Structures are given as structure tokens and as C-alpha cells.
């Protein structure tokens, strides 16, 4: 090697949706890691696996199984910028998960809208002041305890609304 290439970024997308190079939620975490590992055997340069990785255990497994030297976590960090801090603190259950809606890609790239995230309403708005207290608090029922429903309920409660959150399943969190 002459130093022109520092590492390989190996990514496999899907044919569902207009942004085909980004793995969507229909693929399980680390779905293409084995293929990345096979490619890694052909080089001495570091290899970065980029795909759907939500949990620290998945990233650790990919590296431990020698399928990659590094794991990209861009969408996980957009969904929750505290991802690394919470995982290092032993509190992975507090991480707001990326559910691979790919709003972060579609909104900006295809629809010409501002950058955003389906589970983190603050993504792309970090420099704006927080939303203030509601001038007229209301009673609000949020149906669905997935990440978006929980975020809506939390944001509404922070603004002073009286919130009830209903979920059909015994636990919150969605998929």
C-alpha cells in the first residue's frame, strides 16, 4: 500500500425504497457483517462495516468475530447522540433506538426537507432553542408506545400537557 487508501468502507443496501444503498428496517442488525468479514480477509487495510447497527452488542460481536475493524453508527447516533455515553455507563436500555425508518436520508435527499429523524425530533434542530411551555396545557392521549409515541408523550409532558400513553403490548418500545 502507498497510503492513498486508509480503510475500506463496506456497505450493502437493499432494493426497497429510493435510497437503495442504506439498509432499512426490514433487515436485521448486522445482516451483511458476514459478507464484510469475507471481504476483510482479502486486505490488510482496516475495514469499516456500515449497515444497520442499533445495539452495542451487535457492534462488539461484529468486531469480535473479525468481520470488521470498525463499525459505523451514524443512524444510531442521530437517533440518540448519547448512544456511546449511555452504553459505556452500562445503561443501554436508556438509548433511544434507531428503527431504520431512514427519514434522516429520505427527508433531506429525496424530499428537499430539513434534516430529521423519525425517533429523535431534535435531530437537525440542535442549534434552535428548546420548545417552551405550552400557553394552554391540554389533556393528551398518545396511542402507541413505540419510540415515536414515547417521544411525543415526553415532549408534550415537558411542555406542561397532561399526557396518557397507551400501548397494546405489555412493554413500551415498539420493535
Name the predicted role of every residue range:
Residues 1-143, 147-163, 171-173:
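Flavin-dependent oxidoreductase catalytic cores
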Amino acid at each position: 500500500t502507498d497510503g492513498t487508501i486508509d480503510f475500506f468502507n463496506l456497505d450493502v443496501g437493499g432494493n426497497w425504497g429510493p435510497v437503495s444503498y442504506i439498509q432499512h428496517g426490514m433487515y436485521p442488525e448486522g445482516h451483511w457483517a458476514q459478507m464484510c468479514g469475507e471481504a476483510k480477509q482479502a486486505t490488510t487495510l482496516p475495514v469499516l462495516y456500515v449497515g444497520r447497527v442499533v445495539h452495542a452488542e451487535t457492534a462488539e460481536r461484529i468486531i469480535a468475530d473479525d468481520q470488521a475493524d470498525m463499525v459505523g453508527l451514524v443512524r444510531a447516533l442521530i437517533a440518540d447522540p448519547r448512544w456511546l455515553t449511555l452504553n459505556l455507563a452500562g445503561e443501554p436500555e436508556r438509548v433511544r433506538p434507531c428503527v431504520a425508518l431512514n427519514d434522516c436520508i429520505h427527508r433531506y435527499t429525496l424530499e428537499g426537507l430539513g434534516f430529521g429523524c423519525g425517533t429523535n425530533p431534535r435531530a437537525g434542530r440542535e442549534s434552535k432553542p428548546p420548545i417552551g411551555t405550552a400557553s394552554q396545557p391540554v389533556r393528551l392521549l398518545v396511542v402507541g408506545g413505540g419510540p415515536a409515541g414515547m417521544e411525543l408523550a415526553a415532549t408534550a409532558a415537558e411542555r406542561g400537557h397532561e399526557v396518557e400513553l397507551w400501548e397494546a403490548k405489555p412493554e413500551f418500545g415498539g420493535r
